[in-house]
Every structure is written in structure tokens, then in C-alpha cells.
Amino acid sequence: MASYKNNNLVRLCIMGDGGVGKTAVTIQFISNHFVYYYDPTIEDSYRKQCVIDDQVYMLDILDTAGQDELTAMRDQWIRSCEGFVLVYSITSRSSFDQVQFFREQIIRVLDRDDVPIMMIGNKSDLDDERQVTYQEGKDLARCLGMSFMEVSAKSRANIEEVFNETVRSVKRREESLLKKDKSKDGKDIKKKNSIIKKLNQKVNNTKTSICKMM
């Protein structure tokens, strides 16, 4: 049975070059529907409640623009999100080459390199038009410390898995940070107790010396 938690809101950002199918991927996940035609996105926000590993989450998904003229807006989008899905098209070598640019922008804005990022190669149903091999995608993701999947917004292949795994990555990072905080608190308490113990010993030794003099 799924259980609810107060911290079940997860904010995800979809990024990538223009025309790779970011909106198609998002809408397929949200509404089980493939959109053939749509206007270029500037910024659209979607919400979906889903159950992942017996926990209920509300996903707040930001579908962003890929156009160069909107680059200045990305910093704001990046700061508002916890996890990222970087999309390229397997039929477009240039969109694949842009992935590293988007990742570097995320790292720069957040000023850390442990960001949960899923890289996906969309349009896996168009294998006869492929310009980027699966192995190339896998190798780049491993090199840059990202998760990786190929997907098809049209056939829905791996769409659910992409978002589920990205949420898991976000939660794993949160748990890791929480453990570090608890460990630090524990060390601080031990250090404080050690100082108090030494001070008490010093006071007791002083009292003993005074008694001997008397």
C-alpha cells in the first residue's frame, strides 16, 4: 500500500536542444498521448501524481525552451529544480553534441557536480534514421556522471522508467545529504562532550590540588 509523505513534491526540469521532442516526452508521460505538432515551447509546467517504490510523489515538471535566444532564462529554471532530464534525438548528431553544454550550465548554476541528471536519447523508434549509436550515448553519460536511457515519445518506450529513475536519484541524493548532516551533528556532539569531560577533569584535578595544600 502506498504511503504519503510531506516531502513528496519533486521538481524536475526537461532540457535539450530545440526539436528533440522534449514536449512530446513530457506530454506522453503526463497524459499517455503523443503530440505530432506543437508550437515551440518557451516554458510549460505540468504536474502528475505517481507511485514510485510504494511512495506517492507529486512531480512538478518544467518543460523548457531549447532555442538559443532563451538561454538567459535557463538559470532561473535550473535553480528551481532538483532533478534534470537532458534530451537529445538519436536522429540528430548536433543535438547530441549539445548535451554537454546543457550539463555544464546546470553544474555552473547550482555550483555542485552531484546533480541528479538523466540523459535520454529520444526517437528510438526511428532507428533507420539514427545518427547517434546507443553505445555513444551510454559512454557520454558514464563519462559525465549521468544516468542514460533511449526512449520513444511516440511508442512510450522507457518513458515511465525515465521519470521514475530520475525521482529515485533525487531521493537518493536527499538521503545521502541527510546522513552526512546527522554524521556531522554526531561528531559535533562527541567533540563537545569530549571538551566538557576534559574541563571537568581539569576542575577536579584543581580541587584535589587545593585539598592537598590545605
Curated annotation (Swiss-Prot):
Biological process according to GO: response to bacterium; sexual reproduction; signal transduction
Lipidation (S-geranylgeranyl cysteine): 211
UniProt keyword annotation of GTP-binding present: yes
Chief site of localization: membrane
Enzyme Commission number, as recorded: 3.6.5.2
Any GO molecular function: G protein activity
UniProt topology in membrane: Lipid-anchor
Motif Effector region, residue range(s) on this chain: 38-46
Superkingdom of the source species: Eukaryota
Cysteine methyl ester sites (modified residues): 211
Short name of any one Pfam family annotated for the protein: Ras
Propeptide feature ranges: 212-214
Reactions listed under catalytic activity: GTP + H2O = GDP + phosphate + H(+)
Keywords, in A-Z order: Cell membrane, GTP-binding, Hydrolase, Lipoprotein, Membrane, Methylation, Nucleotide-binding, Prenylation
Any single Gene Ontology cellular-component annotation: plasma membrane
Subcellular location: Cell membrane
The keyword Membrane is assigned to this record: yes
Function: Ras proteins bind GDP/GTP and possess intrinsic GTPase activity.
Similarity-based family: Belongs to the small GTPase superfamily. Ras family.
Protein name: Ras-like protein rasZ
Organism: Dictyostelium discoideum
